[in-house]
Amino acid sequence: MLSGDIPPNQTVYLRNLNEKVKKEELKRSLYALCSQYGRILDVVALKTPKLRGQAWVVFSEITAATNAFRGLQEFDFYGKRMRVQYAKTKSDCLATEDGSTAPKEKRKKQEEKAAEKKRRAEEAQQSGPNAAAQSNGTGYQASRLGKTSQEPPAPPNNILFIQNLPAETTSMMLQILFQQYPGFREVRMIEAKPGIAFVEYEDDSQSMVAMQALQGFKITPYNPMAISYAKK
């Protein structure tokens, strides 16, 4: 599908999305899927009758939006083929950046950002003294190395062990990410152990490709995935 006469810009418009997916899960899944193309400023998905099955993803750079436009066309997302084009109008967050929003809208955005910042600060405080270090991956990797230094890593095999996943991660979110690589079979999560998952491929060469591509990938801005081979 072509984007018609709409010139390339920082926002991609996605349609033919599965309308049964809840809004927050849809936004998280789109963030996880699209952030591999570049830094995301905003994901907009509304559940009003006219806007169901649609979403907008705002990138910081036009090149990132262009890569997403090319890479996600006809992508199988929750069982439906995604349709992608460039957005017709400037997104609110981009308008805020260049100062073209009205003062009232700008103030509202600032208030929302302040509330989000406060919420994340409270979460970090509740998580303990190591939360700040873990948010950029260093604390987590150091603790992981400390725990595994006494035992050798598992040899390459067809099953990957995924750690440091955010609590809201779902099997479908991981499937969307890992099914992009050849040989994908399934995702397994353990309800009693949040934050980890197993991803199976047909053989170890295929699992290696996925591991190298997604090592350190952030499903959210604060959780770099740690991927290793599963122990058998």
Swiss-Prot record:
Cellular compartments annotated: Nucleus, Cajal body; Nucleus, Nucleoplasm; Cytoplasm
InterPro entries membership: Nucleotide-bd_a/b_plait_sf, RBD_domain_sf, RRM_dom
Single GO MF annotation: RNA binding
All residue ranges annotated as the RRM domain in the record: 10-89, 158-232
Biased segments, Polar residues type: 127-151
SMART domains for the chain: RRM (SM00360)
Region annotated Disordered, chain positions: 92-159
UniProt keyword annotations, A-Z: Cytoplasm, mRNA processing, mRNA splicing, Nucleus, Repeat, Ribonucleoprotein, RNA-binding, Spliceosome
Function: Involved in nuclear pre-mRNA splicing.
Subunit structure: Component of the spliceosome where it is associated with snRNP U2.
PANTHER family in UniProt: U1 SMALL NUCLEAR RIBONUCLEOPROTEIN A/U2 SMALL NUCLEAR RIBONUCLEOPROTEIN B (PTHR10501)
Protein name in UniProt: U2 small nuclear ribonucleoprotein B''
Biological classification of the source: Eukaryota, Viridiplantae, Streptophyta, Embryophyta, Tracheophyta
